[in-house]
């Protein structure tokens, strides 16, 4: 792909973002991502790729949660005919989720992670790899769930090793990793203690170096720190009474997601 067509695809991705046409945004950024053997993605390009996939997967994750909630209610009422219909519909959403996750995971494995030169980009892509394996673990069952959870843990740990060695405690990508890694411990591994320890350590280390934070990343970093604190408050409160509360993870606006 020539420089001009790479630039054109980036511009088209921005247009698709403005128009909220995220499937097309993914297509444009996939084309850009496949040019990394020439030059790795810029910060802007990798954030566009992340935003595109986050929106495409986010819509399906929300749909899956709603349908699963309705399924539970119908099961409790004994409406077996409705449950059968819902299960089939849930399966359709899960197939879409799997396809999206497989798409970005293949791109990360084949193109983006091998081309990453800086510690920042390595952590960004390994975190992304962990995120999309985690999204698979949210709805898979049995051996597939176990495999997705193990892959998530490996990716997050690899990212964490680099982040702790090479990124400042206040770096938004390091903080975003800690946020999502702690959510993984809480939601997927059912380990509230580990989730709280990880989130608290990340928050405390960032607080102690807050005065060194540059103006350009201050807003991003403090926003993620607030999300870490929100989750800690949620998890350390009466954890038997958190149904309906929303656990925070890095959103499309965060530079780590």
UniProtKB/Swiss-Prot annotation:
Under the heading PROSITE patterns, the entry gives: 1433_1, 1433_2
A Pfam family recorded for this sequence: 14-3-3
Among the entry's GO cellular component annotations, what is one? cytoplasm
Residues making up the signal peptide according to the UniProt record = none
Tell me which InterPro entries the record gives: 14-3-3, 14-3-3_CS, 14-3-3_dom_sf, 14-3-3_domain
State any GO BP term from the record.
protein localization
Write out the similarity annotation: Belongs to the 14-3-3 family.
What is this protein's name? 14-3-3-like protein A
């Amino acid at each position: 792909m020539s420089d001009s067509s790479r630039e054109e695809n980036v511009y088209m991705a921005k247009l698709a973002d403005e128009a909220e046409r995220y499937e097309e945004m993914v297509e444009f950024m996939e084309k850009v991502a496949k040019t990394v053997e020439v030059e790795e993605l810029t910060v802007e390009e990798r954030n566009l790729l992340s935003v595109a996939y986050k929106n495409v997967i986010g819509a399906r994750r929300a749909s899956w949660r709603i349908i699963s909630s309705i399924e539970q209610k119908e099961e409790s009422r004994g409406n077996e005919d409705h449950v059968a219909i819902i299960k089939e519909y849930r399966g359709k959403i899960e197939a879409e989720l799997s396809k999206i996750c497989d798409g970005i995971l293949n791109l990360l494995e084949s193109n983006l992670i091998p081309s990453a030169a800086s510690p920042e980009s390595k952590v960004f892509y390994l975190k992304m790899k962990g995120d999309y394996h985690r999204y698979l673990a949210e709805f898979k069952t049995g051996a597939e769930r176990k495999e997705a959870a193990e892959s998530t843990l490996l990716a997050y740990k690899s990212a964490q090793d680099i982040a702790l060695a090479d990124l400042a405690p206040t770096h938004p990508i390091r903080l975003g990793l800690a946020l999502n890694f702690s959510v993984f411990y809480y939601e997927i591994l059912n380990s509230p203690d580990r989730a709280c320890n990880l989130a608290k350590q990340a928050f405390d280390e960032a607080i102690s170096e807050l005065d060194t934070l540059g103006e350009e990343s201050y807003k991003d970093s403090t926003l993620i720190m607030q999300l870490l604190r929100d989750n800690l408050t949620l998890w350390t409160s009466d954890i038997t009474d958190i149904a309906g509360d929303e656990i925070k993870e890095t959103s499309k606006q965060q530079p780590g997601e």
